[in-house]
Structures are given as C-alpha cells and as structure tokens.
Amino acid sequence: MKLPAAIDEVGDYLADVTALEAAGAAALWIDDGSLDPWVLLGAMAAVTHRIRLGCLLESGLWPPATLATLQKLSRGRTMVAVSDPGATSHRIFIAGPDQDAATGAIFEVQSADQLGAEAARDAHIEVWAAIEVPPDRAAWAEARTAYETAGATGVILPWNERVLDLLRNPEPDDRTDLLISTG
C-alpha cells in the first residue's frame, strides 16, 4: 500500500496504518514528500508489529544513522527504494542480518505480463509491481494471482479507502452462508 506523505489528522493516519496491518497488508510505502519520511516511518513503526515499512526516495540519498535508528525502531522491517533519474523503476534495499538482507525493484506496470524476466525467483530479490486499485473483489483476486504467478513479491496500490475493504474481505460478495431464514 502506498500511503500519502501528507497528513491531515495524525490520529486518523495512524489508525489507517494499524487497520491496514490488521487487514493483512504486507508492506506500507511512503514517498519522501513534504514531511520527513524517517519521522513518519518511526511513528508507523511505533504503532505496528508485523508490516514492513518502506520509503520511496526520489532524491537517492538517505542518512545511514537515521536508517539504522529506524531499523532498530521497526525491528528490522524497513525497506528503502531509490529511483534513478529518468528510470521507470525503483531499486529496493532491505537492511538486516545477512540472511534477511535483500535487494529488488519496484516496477510501474499495466499488467503482470510486463514483469517478464525482471521477476527473478531468487530469495534475495524482491519485485514489487505498482498498480492501480482493482475495481472489485474479482479483479483484486485476479490481479493478486497474476502478479504472484509472474513472480512478483507483491503489488503496491495507491491509498484508497476501498483497498482496506478488499484486504479485509477478498472473497466475492456471495455470502450465502449468512442467509437467515424467517418464518
């Protein structure tokens, strides 16, 4: 999930972060926008326990001491994605013990077919696909399956309140198990 770096109400923002973690999101990403991404990721680390936290850097620079502190606060859940000027992808760096360290890339694609050979199935290579929010549950299930089959580690969706519902209720709307009989 790619969250906006702008915050209107901090309580609502952090509530969305915890709700996304509870709904099963694998990672939350923010841009290095107007707010300090490191402080924002530190706040997110304080209210979460499992979800990975990533920053999409356009500048290509990150302070090593700040990243080390954030890794400590997040218990090793921090990822950094760096964009090369003019590139259509971000390179990902995931710090941690040697067995957990990884690199990878984020690709902005229109379909899973575009990942092709980029989606290497090496345990230390992560491939994230930045996609649009699917229109419904069926499209969400289809997209997840297609990108997983293509070798993607996961998909990154822009923040949309509908995504929380997709994460919480990934199955189609057919809930015949909930029908009640009245006489």
Label for each model-derived stretch:
Residues 1-146, 150-154, 158-183:
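N-terminal glycine-rich cofactor-binding segment that shapes the pocket for flavin-like pterin cofactors
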